[in-house]
Amino acid sequence: MLKGKTIYVRPLEVTDAEENLGLQSENRDFFEQFSMIRADDYYTVEGQRKRITEYQERLEKDEEYHFGIFTASDDRLIGTVSLFQIIRGALQTAFIGYFLDKAHNGKGIMTEAVRLVVDYAFHELKLHRIEAGVMPRNLGSMRVLEKAGFHKEGIARKNVKINGVWEDHQVLAILNPDDEQ
């Protein structure tokens, strides 16, 4: 568990499936503005259980890390933050992605969660670089990353298919400061 001031972050567990389904369902329209098309079973408890089980298997293989973001005050699941497409060897890199309940946007929660996971990625997983891709119109997400220390690197043109449309993405990245020496 990674503890912050107002939240804590921990790997998702199968017992989180119902709560994660609620989070995803309540925020479906909000999240789908910036996400890929979901499989039909995504919005079912069984689909969430299956997905979380797959997440746990990938964590064991050091391929992906999917964390739930929980309120410190009442242990409610309010978002997720993930490290994925981890490449070891000479690159030591990963991508980061996240979702936060729209009711909690603008409170610094996601910045806190991203900082916790980046710190974990650099100090525990020994990654060198973490990259994110953000649709240029998603200004809130870009602010989160910049406040967490990411820097803009350029635009990846027509990079990800979102809701049937190939979208440009602003590429942002952060480097492990321990590797700068």
From Swiss-Prot:
<dbReference type="InterPro" id="IPR016181">
    <property type="entry name" value="Acyl_CoA_acyltransferase"/>
</dbReference>
<feature type="domain" description="N-acetyltransferase">
    <location>
        <begin position="7"/>
        <end position="172"/>
    </location>
</feature>
<dbReference type="InterPro" id="IPR000182">
    <property type="entry name" value="GNAT_dom"/>
</dbReference>
<comment type="function">
    <text>Probable N-terminal protein acetyltransferase.</text>
</comment>
<keyword id="KW-0808">Transferase</keyword>
<dbReference type="InterPro" id="IPR051531">
    <property type="entry name" value="N-acetyltransferase"/>
</dbReference>
<dbReference type="Pfam" id="PF13302">
    <property type="entry name" value="Acetyltransf_3"/>
</dbReference>
<protein>
    <recommendedName>
        <fullName>Probable N-acetyltransferase YjcK</fullName>
        <ecNumber>2.3.1.-</ecNumber>
    </recommendedName>
</protein>
<dbReference type="GO" id="GO:0005737">
    <property type="term" value="C:cytoplasm"/>
</dbReference>
<keyword id="KW-0012">Acyltransferase</keyword>
<dbReference type="GO" id="GO:0008999">
    <property type="term" value="F:protein-N-terminal-alanine acetyltransferase activity"/>
</dbReference>
<comment type="similarity">
    <text>Belongs to the acetyltransferase family. RimJ subfamily.</text>
</comment>
